[in-house]
Amino acid sequence: MTAETIIELSGVEKRFGTLTAVRDLDLELVKGEFFSLLGPSGCGKTTALRMIAGFQEPSSGTIRIDGEDVSTVPANRRPTNMVFQSYAIFPHLDVGDNVGFGLHRSGLSRKERRARVSEALELVELGGYERRRANQLSGGQQQRVALARALVMRPKVLLLDEPLSALDKNLREAMQLELRRLQQSIGITFVMVTHDQYEAMTMSDRIGVMFNGQLEQVDTPQTLYASPGTRSVANFIGGMNFLPARLHNEGGGTLDMEIAGFGAMAVGRNPNVADHGRNALVGIRPEQLEIAAHRPEGYDSTVQCRVADIAFYGESIHYFVEVDGVPETMTVAVPNYFHSVDFTRGATAWLGVQAASVIDLGRNRDNETQQGEKT
Amino acid sequence: MPLRTDTSKGLALGAPATLYVGLLVVAPLGMLVAYSFWTQTYVAIDHSLTWENYRSAIGDPLVRHLLFRSVWIAALVTLMTVLLAYPIAYFIAFRTERKALWLLLITIPFWTSYLLRVFAWKLILGFNGLLNSGLQGLGLIHEPMTWLLYNEFAVVLTLAHAWAPFAILPIYVSLQKIDRRLLEAATDLGSGKLERFFRVTLPLTIPGIISSSLIIFIPTVGDYVTPALVGGADGKMIANLIQVQFGPANDWPLGATLSLLAMVTVGIVAVGYVLLLRFLGSRIR
Ligand SMILES: Nc1ncnc2c1ncn2[C@@H]1O[C@H](COP(=O)(O)OP(=O)(O)O)[C@@H](O)[C@H]1O
Ligand SMILES: [Mg+2]
């Protein structure tokens, strides 16, 4: 354990009867970082967070916070505080008493407590709201009260369970940036649970991606985007076109591949993939594909395609195209740049891609299971 | 006749309720008020208006005593019932998965008539009752305890038992409504179980406690069956006196006056109680 570690989970597992909600979780969080647990609904994120908070006891494994084993420490004595998904604002108390709730046992005088409360409310830009009742607050304001109520405790770790999911889109995006700024200014470690990849990407220093109770990859948003370690991660972070490929030669830094539809290319080796085989899988991000009416110049590979469908997103346009030799329809995302490209459904077009944009995803397990099923 | 305006439509829709309330609440109450200002002569009613009934009722020490005792007994019954009901409601709301079964068990006493339940207590508490003969049989006491029946204690016990389900249900509902995350939030902010109960659970169930209390208190002040059957001489309450006026004494105007006095007293005590509890609740931080 390094001096900087604030939370250390080792071999943490949680079983509910026959269901294993979290399995074999190993994780080290660094002091002052903004960490997100990202994954689809039901993958065990909340359970993991609640074990850190102390609301749920691990079936096995240990949890250390700031070097101390807290596995058997009850929730009310852990140096963590939580922002609940539904905010859990006490309806019988006003804003000031909500925020000051946890300071009763602090040994502070009434005056000091009041100062701490108003300081915390200033921090979340609710200065002067002390005497408002909880039911007079909007969703965004309740969220801030919940945040102030937790931060006023000066926890070593702040836990946030889908803190923004109940807000509407504009407010949510504003709050993402604000939460991030707040975290950077106070320097407390934040652990956030979310199923929203954009939220995790914009806010976090590092993201842990979870599926079915299993932590699949822990990395910076940039690395998760550029070098996802598994197909599920690649699929969950951003959009991805998956293409089967044949691996001919894996000497040196690049892999010589024959990619379905796109032909031979030298693909950079993905450091997060360990297992390679003759049946390979590669991915191409929709925004890394060029689409043009004529064969584009200067690309490592170009192929002809047919536009099957179009979706207009405002800031971008998605073309769903079919390419000979590629089993699944591919997605091409084009920035809506003065309508520079404009195809109609059924049109024929050209795709261009650079070898540097092709992501090596290792052995193609889909293929193997399919073959396995056949035999 | 076609309905032309929203107003007439509204009146038509509201008519049955208005009629119902008018016939069953306003009319009887109006008659009661009217009677209280009349006078009973030997066989007929003197319809000239007078405050005399009120003057003599309030001036009568027996009336004041019975009124005070009714409120006192009702307050005792309410306190005892709510104190017993709260833990039961808490158990059903938080400590068991078989809520429906427990709620059903609680209503079982209601499957028999109220009168039978009162008689059952008579059988249990009486001179040759279950309790006395049982304890004598076990050799724990040598002669029957006579203080069990025909006093305030018997009235309070019988009523507390009779009202228990009515007290449990509102408290149970208010406990059940509490968002469990609020309790977790209190724990997260450092509260132990006891502190959490007094700072979150209890204040959030004050509406339930208020409904429970009023549901018991209001009818108990006016109860006359229980005091008549198990109350003995010093268990008598105001309703017994009212019943006498409408029955044997045949003085309806005085009966009406006593009824209204009891109603006003109950009203004042109830409002004071609600305000007090609300105030206490708002003091919890
Ligand atoms: N208290 C519990 N009892 C039984 N199963 C639970 C409990 N809490 C969560 N689960 C199950 O564990 C799995 C993970 O749940 P959760 O951690 O809430 O997922 P997420 O937050 O990622 O949506 C789900 O299948 C859920 O049904
Ligand atoms: Mg969750």
Task: Describe every region a protein language model picked out.
Chain A
Residues 62, 68, 214:
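ATP-binding/catalytic-site motifs of ATP-hydrolyzing domains
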Residues 240, 250-375:
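Non-catalytic connector elements of ABC transporters
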Residues 34, 75-235:
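ABC ATPase nucleotide-binding domains
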Residues 46-49, 145:
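ABC ATPase nucleotide-binding domain helices that frame the ATP-binding cleft
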Residues 38-40:
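The feature captures the beta-strand-to-loop junction immediately N-terminal to the Walker
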Residues 56-64:
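Conserved post-Walker A/P-loop segment of ABC ATPase nucleotide-binding domains
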Residues 53:
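Helix-to-loop junction immediately C-terminal to a conserved catalytic motif
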